[in-house]
């Protein structure tokens, strides 16, 4: 569980390497990976309705990264954006969970000053309830969370940079909602 007074851990390269999962693009079975030219670009994809041909290797080099690691569940990445659809089938297994908190609770069970922060916190509404479907939201928070840690190799949707091997072992997403529709938090 998340603690605000935690002592930083020192992790050696060896320990980090041992806890990481590995794969290649060929091993991923996510149906939309072929359209994710920004992750793996073999130069055979077309963009803009087939008018623009992609450029081989004009990507973020995910194949090389995946050979080293597809993610590590001990890593928590905070997404500061609109809300994230925490129950999305391609995200749910990689959403951070604060075990001490209860979803939609108004109580601050862990004493960190944020009531109900089970998956993060909605700073716009000062609530642990994350909203992702406001009529004015664009879905950007869920999109960003998906690029970072959609569950890899689960036969659903997209692949991600650090979504693990498909066994819930990807980096965890902590939602820090700072935008909602036309509203923001500072």
Range-by-range predicted roles:
Residues 54, 59, 63-185:
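Subtilisin-like serine protease catalytic core
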Residues 1-76, 86-94, 122-127:
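Protease zymogen maturation seam
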